[in-house]
A protein has these predicted regions:
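Iron-sulfur-associated redox domains of electron-transfer enzymes in respiratory
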Residues: 1-132
Length: 132
């Protein structure tokens, strides 16, 4: 596995479950699964003009983790830094009904929700591992 850093830009939406799963899966990758490779990028800061976020995305590959069909992470990266290396689309992975379900507080997550987070985290890791 290459030692290259990879930016992971999660959905920041709070209206749907897909956003919550996106953020929790990204955190799991960053803290547990690929702590030496994953660098999380903050979407609100990115959009607001955060040069550090934007410059990182110009220099390193970025994986966008999209919670819904708006694809805000991909759009922001393409607008401010260039193409994303890959996309994890939660609606495609878990189903649109799941991605667009009512959001759940982190403290109210069920085992089923945690399983969804694990599925998305594994997909992020698979995409990271394909980057040589």
């Amino acid at each position: 596995m290459a030692d290259i850093k990879v930016g992971v830009l999660a959905c920041s939406g709070e209206e749907f479950l897909g956003g919550t799963i996106s953020r929790l899966a990204t955190r799991r990758v960053m803290e547990e699964l690929r702590p030496d490779r994953a660098v999380t990028l903050c979407l609100p800061l990115y959009i607001a003009g955060g040069e550090e976020e934007r410059n990182f995305a110009k220099e390193y590959p970025v994986i966008a983790v999209e919670g819904c069909s708006k694809h805000c992470s991909t759009c922001a990266t393409e607008k401010f830094s260039g193409n994303v290396h890959d996309i994890v689309d939660i609606a495609a992975l878990l189903g649109e009904d799941t991605a667009l379900a009512k959001t759940v507080s982190a403290r109210d997550l069920t085992e089923k929700h945690q399983d969804m987070v694990k599925i998305v985290a594994r997909e992020i890791c698979a995409k990271m591992d394909s980057i040589v």
